[in-house]
Amino acid sequence: MINIKLYEGLNLKHLTLLGQGYQGKVYKINSSKCIKIFKKREVCFDEIETLVMCQKDSHFPKLYSFGEDYIIREYIDGIELDKYLSKNKLTSYICENIIAIYKAMNSVGFKRLDIALFHIFITPSNNFKVIDTARAMKKESIYPSILLKGLDSLGYKDDFLS
């Protein structure tokens, strides 16, 4: 007998895999929701904690439900900022939105005010959304070194800082 684990009645075999990384896998449920399955329960708890903190800010996905090793959250349709900037120029609009995300991270109480460019999505309606918050409380950092390193690798660090 094959044992298939269901998450809130969802069979992952029937869902589209959006991506996988160090923390786990993300599957699309429908046009508005996705499920993130974590390899480690501790990381899942960290992401739940940070998503709860930022539910009132539009830069972060809505959290719908969760379990000990998964979350169901808002599906963010869009393109990662690093991929976007590899084909498009850095504009003042993009800079303003990066700064707005930094301010939002601070206002919701995150300790780590830094983010990788691939964790920022630009939606088709040109909104900027953060898709991964699990490490936001792990260490204290007010200098966005990861963000600046990403911009530097694309040749935009000096433009951003000017």
Per-range role (PLM):
Residues N3-I48:
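ATP-binding glycine-rich loop module of kinase domains
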Residues G19, K62-F66, R112-L113:
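Short beta-strand
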Residues K28-S31, E74-Y75, T123:
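Active-site beta-strand termini and strand-to-loop segments that position acidic
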Residues Q55, M105-N106, G155:
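Protein kinase-like catalytic domain
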Residues D82-F128, P144:
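Conserved kinase catalytic-core helix
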